[in-house]
Amino acid sequence: MAFRGFDAAKLSTLANDLDTLGRNSGTLHSRLAALLTTVQQNLPPGQSASRNPDLQDLVGDLVPMPFFGRRRLPGSLGGELGDMQASMKRRIKQLEGLQELERRGYPVSDGTLFLDEQPPDPKKIDDALRHLQELQGKDFGTNGNRDDLEKISGELDGLTAGELDALMTKASPKDLAFYNQLLTNTDDSLLNPFDENGLPEDRRRDTLSRMLAKISPENVPKFQAAFPGMQPTFTNTGAYEDGGNDQNGQSNNGIHWATPGDPLFKDGVSADDINQHQFGDCWYVASLAGLAQKDPKFVQDGIKQNPNGTVSVRVWDKDGNYQWVTMTADLPTDQNGNPISTYGNGESWPAYYEKAFALVYSDDGDGERGYGGIEGDDPKKSAPYLTGKEGDDLTTGGFLGLGEHDDKNIQSLKKAFDSGKVVTVSTPDDESLEKNHPPEWEPSYCTNHAYYVRGFTADGKIILGNPWGSSYPPITVSQDQFDKYFQGPEAFDVP
């Protein structure tokens, strides 16, 4: 009997047939190759056993070699069909487990059907749900609640997508909200200043990211309501408070959350994909663009879209801990549906890198978090979050740290760039430079702004890219111009 469009019995028959075909493909390969080889041996020189090049390749290939050389049909079907039928059988068992789960009265969302995971275990769901509910009114003792929360996080991390989604559906909004309240409150109690409460931010975010990546789309709004800290605020940004970015002239009449229609990638990753738009985080976006230029594959491998539509980005936190940060797909958007945050040319991957950074970054000098917390800072501070490696000032002179100053020698920057490093520079906050820079740099030069190094000319000039995007052409700068109009060269290694 079909279950929401899936007929487990018919799928099992198909999987068994594929298994049989896969196991017989080697025999078919050898017989076909033997026939073609015999034909070839009985033909005059210069003639082929077959006009089909794929069949002609089988001449002499009597034994299919699955591990060495080029794999040819039909012998190569053994591995491919074997993998396919094994995956189908695992998914069928999961589907049958969901059917049984529903018969027992558990909620089952369509988004969890036919996943490649273990069948759901009702006891694991019941245990995790009971422990979640028991947090209400529980006496956590003198050592605080962290050990209890660690236990529940471990339980939640161990649930399959189907199990976790059933728990999310059955759990009350009140229980989920109280769990979030306990997770986020790390203060000591008044009676015992040495107890441990809540979970550290990285551990908390890791558990919630795993949950958000697994649950069905139907449960995402419920998750958002229970765990609002998994959405970075934009109400503390200049774009929200002032209606735009006064440096690049972009403006808006209001910001709201909306999901873009563009894919993560259209033509892979390129620095030219990146357009900073209205948030004032040029320091981060310049570093991201420089990294995309140096190692586009590293950037592309660091982001993925989950089956439920959420997006996960690879981020290191300020302590060097590596994790995948999961977020909903909606982005800050203006009244006309245009992106407010960093975006690409018909592709959305830069926006999610920025959103993940806004969730994680906690080093703002004013204590701000979210998008407002990543406005106006130092490019090298973004390096540990992007790569797990520290960024460095490029300096020269001095003794024992005294008297050092910016190394503005273009050849020094070229040496760092040629060694594989991402190199960024900044401009002073100087109104006179804003008014009196070389006209050929229009519209790309701006004071109090960050740039990334794109390359160097044969005659010793440096080429700088503006994170505002491809509408702002790279500028070519001589040594004298660099000394006057730029400062703060920094660099970081690419993994």
Give the ranges of each region predicted by the language model.
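Non-catalytic all-alpha helical scaffold/repeat segments
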Residues: 105-234
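Generic detector of well-ordered alpha-helical segments enriched in charged/polar residues
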Residues: 33-36, 56, 60, 78, ...
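Generic beta-strand structural signal
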Residues: 305-306, 456-458
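Acidic helix-start/capping segments at beta-turn-to-alpha-helix junctions
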Residues: 35-40, 304-315
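Surface-exposed patches in mature extracellular/periplasmic domains of secreted proteins
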Residues: 296-305
